[in-house]
Amino acid sequence: MSATLDGSATSELLGNAPVVKSEGRTYPVDIIYGQARQPKERVIDRMVATIKRALEDNPTSSVLAFLPGQGEIRRTADELSNWIHDRKIQGVHLRPLFGNLSIEEQQQAIAPLPGNKEPGKYKNDQKVVLATNIAETSLTIEGVDVVVDSGLVREAKFNPAIGMTGLHTAKISKASSIQRAGRAGRVRPGKCYRLWSADQQQQLAAHSSAEILNADLAPLALQLLQWGVDSPSELSWLDEPPRGAWQQAIDLLSSLGAIKQEAHGWVLTEHGQAMTSLPVHPRLSHLLVCGAARGAIKPAALLASLLSDRDPFSRDHADISHRLDILSGKSNCPSIHQGWLYRTRQLAQQFEQQLFNVKPPGQLAYLITAEQLPGYLLACAYPDRIARRRYSGGYQLANGRSANLVGQQHLAKNTWLAVAEVSSQTGGKGDTIRSAVKLDESLFESALSDAVQQQTIAEWDKKANRFIAEEQQKIGALVLQRTRLDSVPAEAKSAALIQHIRKQGLTLLPWTPALKQWCARVSLLRSIEGGQNWPDTSDEALLATLEEWLAPYLNEVNLLNDFKKLNLAEIIHALVPWEQQQLLNSLAPTHLSVPSGSSICIDYSESPPVLAVKLQEMFGCEQTPTVVAGKVPLLIHLLSPAGRPLQVTQDLAGFWRSSYHDVKKDMKGRYPKHPWPDDPLIAVATRKTKNRM
């Protein structure tokens, strides 16, 4: 197994199998660390400077430099070429190495320089191989004993939310850094220059994350279903497939018609069985089987072979029909590498041969013209990437994403596209369509009718600020046709309105202060009795249970103002039976009679409840008033004649004995018309001035 894998985890999975380590024949490698890279410093600048240093420090050595991707390799090569030209340096040969190169170009990077083929015999010429992680484990590069490592790798990560794989630049693991450094010690002692510090080395993850954690799981899911396994939990894994990616894979296979759900779980359909006989991604096997079912084996094989290989065409040419014309020999493109043409055509022939042994479920209905065929086949493979042009420009995809065509005037004239590849645009400008072909809209009524879904939509229209119900014909997020409905089932309508209320909050409903106080009174009794006998009337609980208490009353709500017409007090009061409402009024009354004879409102929105009353109205009251049968003392806000708080207390007797006299001293001169007796416990409580008593 590879040195970059976690051997202990594999051993544990295999019942604690013994681990045998073979170090191989290696030579010592000196590790030379750099400084931590500054936030605005380009990795290319650091790489170019370090390669120059490595060449000067090791004038008889060739260098292997690890960069994250093709773009960085090309830019690094350009800057080194300028340096070599400006300095008139002789004998330094730059060799890129990445997967998109031809076999001949890759061989130039791997093979020794002419005259340097004998081990241990070096001339003055030096080779600089600028490589992706393709050179980390799988290739042996002759003559290299110096490595310059950027510490970065470009990884393909599948996003199950949108069903697409994107490239992300990440730091390598410790295991990968050791593997890369080891390239310098294959044939003699070497050096490894790392573009990061020793401290940063210690912070790297021990191992790279397993591919299964970031991959498109559709091929795996199809294979497991072929074995009769419809859930990852039925197997033992080093790393269990992520649930989100697995569910996306199942959804994709279902949309391709490869699987169906039965009582005991997911099973392959006859169409899915045919797909499993083709050693390609399920999207392409579906394309091939659909092509065979329409008697279009050759065009389907050609398109599948095109989608299987790296695209050598310029990013400015997204039209797949142009590529197909070149592959089929209908047009010529001298700049396209002949090796790519040969490989792709050979692969197409292999697909044709494999399809002769595949039995499609039957001939499909509806005729398709040769002009419609590429769009149809591509839409079969990528139904989630069917795209429609927006009025504002660009395209919207069936998966809900937006994307643009850059410099594609001919292709951009089409209202509908079948899209094969979409890439993220830097700078937050959305996605870019990299390869696509025009799609005939009439196919949605014929050959692609299975992709069209009928859906009844009941929702709150934000723009119109009203409830709407309509029948929609959709392909994913793309609405083909809308038909307004006069009525929908009450359950669907209430569900839509409840969803809107949850988004906007309970403030949409016609609350009154009295109703808010009623809910607070119920909440108080609920807290005293430990949740027994009384409903939860908190905002959180009411929002969570809208289906139970509000849904039956929403049938007449269509406009925003209709919410205000609801008799919310009656609806909320219905949460408490009549007998309990009488108990509520007794245990948690809305008002309290104070010594002056006034009936003062109790505020239950605070904890404890608050009684705000003028100080003079409480003369003679020694005991703090309570509610809930004496269990909850009220918090007394004693107010000035002007209604401003003078004292807040739950100990009324203690206030009269102590703090009252300080308050009296401060307030008597300010409010001389009101009584300020020396002994408030024997004074007559009043809400009047002294002259009116």
Regions picked out by a protein language model, each given a short descriptive name:
Residues 1-287, 423, 607, 616:
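P-loop NTPase motor module signature
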Residues 155-165, 368, 373-374, 565-581:
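A short, flexible low-complexity segment enriched in Lys/Arg and Gly/Pro that occurs
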Residues 90-91, 96, 148, 153-156, ...:
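Second RecA-like catalytic domain
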Residues 15, 389-391, 584-588:
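A short, compositionally biased
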Residues 13, 144, 273, 407-410, ...:
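Composition- and surface-driven signal marking solvent-exposed, interaction-prone regions
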Residues 182, 418-440, 614-635:
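Short, solvent-exposed cationic patches
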Residues 396-398, 404, 466-693:
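Charged, non-catalytic accessory extensions
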Residues 2-3, 31, 133, 196, ...:
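Active-site proximal loops enriched in glycine and acidic residues that flank catalytic Cys/His/Asp
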